[in-house]
């Protein structure tokens, strides 16, 4: 079985990462490609007994997420990661662990993310009860050279872009 790619989707909270991941997953399933979505929130809930957001907690979480994605890719499964991963160092580490990484940047303006926020994250950040939210209290380090830039989670052209660069035979594109 040949290795597959990791598609690492990054962007501000509520930018459309999960929606993009699900659109990509649907396309891959229709193509008969084994795939799995690792949504950062879901993985954190499933694997972290007492989730925290300190720098150390985040370092550990993103390392775990990258290792899990790389493990799936080595087993022939396209791993689709949807996680804020607001520091370049997190994404760089993922690329070290998964050399066939395709980085997708969901480029959604902060104001739009705040309007779409169904979890109330931005309201909590403004009130001080979520002081660690990337984009408000912490900087979001946008990727300098992402493989794909998407305008929100419903950018079908960007989904097609991922499919075009996805290794078809397990070799790097």
Give the predicted meaning of each segment.
Residues 9:
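Hydrophobic anchor at the beta1->P-loop junction of P-loop NTPases
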Residues 107, 115-173:
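Small-molecule kinase domains that catalyze NTP-dependent phosphoryl transfer to phosphate-bearing small molecules
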Residues 56-102, 106, 112, 122-125, ...:
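Glycine-rich phosphate-binding loop used to anchor ATP phosphates in small-molecule kinases
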Residues 14:
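Walker A (P-loop) phosphate-binding loop of P-loop NTPases
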